Regions:
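Long, polar low-complexity repeats
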Residues: 185-187, 203, 210-236
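Aromatic-rich beta-strand edge motifs centered on tyrosine
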Residues: 79-84, 107-112, 129-139, 171-178, ...
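Surface-exposed acidic, glycine/proline-enriched linker/cap segments
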Residues: 149-177
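Acidic, low-complexity segments
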Residues: 73-75, 123-128, 134-135, 191-192, ...
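Long, intrinsically disordered, low-complexity, charged/polar and glycine-rich segments
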Residues: 1-117, 123-126, 171-175, 281
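Beta-strand-dense domains in secreted/periplasmic systems and polymorphic toxin scaffolds
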Residues: 70, 80, 121, 187, ...
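Active-site-proximal structural scaffolding
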Residues: 63, 73, 111-114, 124, ...
Length: 281
């Protein structure tokens, strides 16, 4: 009697290069624009197959070939996704100790894609702009899901294929959610411009959340430099440096704040930034 089905369609929002709007997928699997610019949307490569149990237990992820193609009235084609580095996704897990020792996630839930990032622009004359993203794996962690799992009373006898309740035990348990974000790595513009913009990033010196949770968390990243090359020759570069401030709180909930401390431009010089927030590291 507690089984319920959600028939409300998911709303997909898009916003790129001056075009914005929303669309839904109807019961026949076709996209329908519900507001915003008129565009043609191709979902033929948007794969949503259920994962195998092995995929669920070993750092699961969406199908890597999933992509959305949007064509605007001026004939430009915009491609989103198409590889895992350009898909933002998240999933729930159990048995948190498995994260610490690098083992599988032991999850009984499928992972959901939250966003598809722009990977390519194709002009009517076939000129292209390509966007690539860093292969980061999971970059965020949240331990509040237990508040929801307390309400699970056991799986019903009949389950829809993609049910979130599949194989969950009748008793409550502590669970975790992990999120994989997309971090832009480079933009390449072909002839006649022959430009490449590299966004160089590294693992931050300190993690920017509760110190007591750091053992469970993946590293976060910081932007170190933006490098522009033209015809394979250096053209312009900006380097960034950061400072950290330790914030001590009660209940072992201390954390760091990060501040931009210096910007160096190859064609201008350096800028120093100072803050009135106490000592920095």
């Amino acid at each position: 009697n507690n089984l319920a089905f959600d028939y409300q369609p998911d709303i997909f929002h898009f916003n790129f290069c001056g075009h914005s709007g929303s669309f839904i997928i109807d019961n026949d699997g076709n996209p329908t624009v519900i507001n915003g610019d008129f565009v043609e949307i191709d979902l033929s490569n948007l794969v949503n197959d259920e994962q195998t149990q092995n995929e669920k237990e070993n750092y699961p992820h969406p199908k890597s070939s999933a992509k959305i193609i949007i064509t605007t009235l001026d004939g430009y084609q915009y491609i989103f996704g198409g590889n895992l580095s350009a898909i933002e996704y998240s999933g729930g897990i159990r048995a948190a100790t498995k994260i610490k020792d690098g083992g599988g996630m032991c999850t009984s839930r499928f992972v959901a894609a939250n966003a598809w990032y722009l990977t390519q622009i194709i002009a009517p004359d076939k000129r292209t702009v390509n966007f690539s993203y860093k292969n980061t794996g999971y970059t965020d962690y949240n331990d509040n899901i237990w508040r929801f799992t307390e309400h699970y009373v056991g799986p019903p006898t009949a389950l829809p294929k993609h049910s979130l309740y599949k194989n969950i035990t009748p008793t409550s348990f502590t669970g975790y959610t992990l999120s994989k974000e997309c971090i832009l790595e480079s933009i390449t513009i072909d002839s006649p411009y022959n430009l490449r913009i590299d966004f160089r990033s590294s693992v931050a010196q300190h993690k920017l959340y509760s110190v007591s949770r750091c053992g469970m968390c993946k590293p976060n990243y910081q932007l170190d430099a933006v490098v522009v090359t033209k015809n394979n020759r250096p053209f312009r570069q900006a380097n960034l440096r950061y400072a950290y401030q330790y914030r001590e709180e009660d209940n072992d909930n201390s954390y760091y704040w990060r501040f931009l401390s210096r910007v160096t431009l190859s064609d201008i010089g350096s800028y120093q930034l100072e803050y009135g927030h106490g000592s920095m590291e």
